[in-house]
Amino acid sequence: ELPAAVRAWASADVPVDFHATHDAVEREYTYHLHSPGASLSRAEDAVEALSGTHDFHNFTPDETGTVRHLDGNVVGDGEFLVVTLTSDGFPRQFVRRAVTVIDAVASGAAGLDRIESLLGEEPLDGPAGLAPAPPEPLVLTAVEYPPVDFEPDASALASARDVFGSNAIDYRTNARVASTIAEGIDREQ
């Protein structure tokens, strides 16, 4: 049984040897990066520099599977940059580390030369390395499994909408409460 926060709303018949990780031919991740004041233009330049086929060995602790083709996009949404990355596979922590450098470039803390050095052959560890961004804003938004054809379940879809709709209201409410407290603290100063 899945935890209450995990929802499946479609299923498919697959061969016995099907493997959800290894049989996927494309994955898409979306990261909601809170970065007020960031330059969308600089973020777009960073995503463009990361796009294409590269050895991303400095973006993961993995020793193998680091050469990947990446397609990316970023849009501004208020105080957020919404970063979408698509590939045939992602090494561990790759998306979160890519977001770290996109944020650094977008905020002006780093230039595009930072991406060039991270894509270089030299391993960069410690202070020269790249820490992963927090996991909470990361969403796996699509996975492609040809020729698997998923069939949505109407009641599961309705349940998922209800759960995530309720979660959205709860989180917005919590954000308002936290903002009220922060504003109250500021007034006391």
Residue ranges and their predicted role:
Residues 1-189:
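Structured-RNA-binding interfaces characteristic of tRNA pseudouridine synthases
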